Every structure is written in structure tokens, then in C-alpha cells.
Amino acid sequence: MIRKYWWLVVFAVFVFLFDTLLMQWIELLATETDKCRNMNSVNPLKLVNCDELNFQDRM
């Protein structure tokens, strides 16, 4: 049976690897800027840009 459907196994592995790489690429594009947690805010779970926090610390 494996001899008959080897191409299907190869295709499934290829699709799995392609999907994994695609999701990693999308995640990399979506998070261009570094995100940090502002522990001094009302909602510390909300992610904000780290540059904004650094700017507030300087003032």
C-alpha cells in the first residue's frame, strides 16, 4: 500500500512543512516592532510598542 500511495505521504509532509513555514513567516511580518507589557498601566496584559515605553521612561 505504501508503494502505491507514496506520493500522498510525500505530499502530506510537504503541505505540513509549507504550512508551518507560512505561519512562521506571517507571524514574523505581523510583529515588526517589539512588543512589551506596560506594568504601570491599568491593563498590564495589553501589548504596547517598546519604543513608547522607553519614551515615557525618559520623561
From Swiss-Prot:
One GO cellular component term: plasma membrane
Lineage top rank: taxon: Bacteria
Membrane-spanning residues: 6-26
Membrane topology: Single-pass membrane protein
Keywords: Cell inner membrane, Cell membrane, Membrane, Transmembrane, Transmembrane helix
InterPro entries linked to this entry: DUF2556 (IPR022540)
Localization of this protein: Cell inner membrane
Range of residues in the leader sequence: none
Name of this protein: Inner membrane protein YhdU
Species in which this protein is naturally found: Escherichia coli (strain K12)
Encoding gene per record: yhdU
